[in-house]
Amino acid sequence: MNTRKIQMPREVYIGPDVIYETGEICKDLHLDNKVLVLTGPNTYDIAAKHAIESLENQDIEVDVKIVEKVSYDSVEEVSEMITSGTNVLGVGGGKVIDVAKLASYDKNVFFVSMPTTASHDGIVSPLASIKNPKTSTSAKAHAPIAVIADSKIIANSPFRLLSAGCADLISNFTAIKDWQLAHRLKNESYSESAASLSIMSAKMITDNVDSIKPGLEESARLVVKTLFSSGMAISIAGSSRPASGSEHTFSHALDKILDKPCLHGEQCGVGTILMMYLYGGDWKFIRDSLKAVGAPTSAKELGISDENVIDALTMAHTIRPERYTILGDNGISEDAAYELALKTGVIK
């Protein structure tokens, strides 16, 4: 029987001060025995302590673990803390939520996603990004049973993070082109519904760039809802294909090259300009949309060298070689990479 499982959150809560309802929400979901709260060193004071207080007000037993990084060691360490009857609440950015996903999946318990930023679509997807000694890889996990997104907290986070989330969403445009290309040339499985949802998510950002401003609760709410729909596209597809193509392999190549990589969404945004040019698409529209939401559009704005861009472009096809993209099996030459980056203004 050709059966496929599509995981989605049971409930999603988005709004100002919703964090103070954490205990009631977990109680309603019958996650009221014991909760392991995972958070970061900065997000404890910003958000986690309020969630913990709300849980304790509902007489829910709470353990707390500060997560410093995403690695197999940190996931294993958290997994060992999950005892019978314990569920997981991930409070923070992408790293914390990825550890929550992986550890809860390992122990087959529920987890609740509580993002404090809206910097990428991992807040709801069933996949997690985890670093190994060479690069970041996508690991299978499970979707959260619920998402609690306090739009006031997210609006008060650095605008650069929200801008990066917008750039990550805009990158769906080239991700879908790559997926369609792989479907035509390699007969790769393709989902029209997942692709349509992914493109709709990207258009929600490009159609509303003038509404995305620093400190606005409405801006945070819009981006979170759009990241949610993009994450749902990933769930429907059963892979990250709807939101990850050649622009993401460019970003992952930069991760390998740079001692201190830029934000994931920022790198993907610049990659989208480059890959849209290769497709003969409207790369200027991509560039202008990124500028409108405050995202970088050049090596200089990313704070990296021209050589870093060229190296990443020529290396990108070696990242996830099983995933066919516009870069093909053999990639592009150094001369072609230079011309591409120069013509799009990514380098000067």
From Swiss-Prot:
Pathway: Membrane lipid metabolism; glycerophospholipid metabolism
InterPro entries: G1P_dehydrogenase_arc, G1PDH, Glycerol_DH
Positions of Zn(2+) binding: D168, H248, H264
EC number: 1.1.1.261
Cofactor note: Binds 1 zinc ion per subunit.
Biological process annotations from GO: glycerophospholipid metabolic process; phospholipid biosynthetic process
SUPFAM superfamilies registered for this protein in UniProt: Dehydroquinate synthase-like (SSF56796)
Catalytic reaction equation(s): sn-glycerol 1-phosphate + NAD(+) = dihydroxyacetone phosphate + NADH + H(+); sn-glycerol 1-phosphate + NADP(+) = dihydroxyacetone phosphate + NADPH + H(+)
GO molecular function, one term: glycerol-1-phosphate dehydrogenase (NADP+) activity
Protein residues bound to substrate: D121, D168, H252
Domain of life of the native organism: Archaea
Localization per record: Cytoplasm
Parts forming coiled coils: none
Cofactor requirements of the protein: Zn(2+)
GO CC annotation terms, alphabetical: cytoplasm
Entry keyword annotation includes Oxidoreductase: yes
Family: Belongs to the glycerol-1-phosphate dehydrogenase family.
Oligomeric and partner information: Homooctamer.
Protein role: Catalyzes the NAD(P)H-dependent reduction of dihydroxyacetonephosphate (DHAP or glycerone phosphate) to glycerol 1-phosphate (G1P). The G1P thus generated is used as the glycerophosphate backbone of phospholipids in the cellular membranes of Archaea.
Protein name per UniProt: Glycerol-1-phosphate dehydrogenase [NAD(P)+]
Organism: Methanobrevibacter smithii (strain ATCC 35061 / DSM 861 / OCM 144 / PS)
Lineage start: Archaea, Methanobacteriati, Methanobacteriota, Methanomada group, Methanobacteria
Gene name of the record: egsA
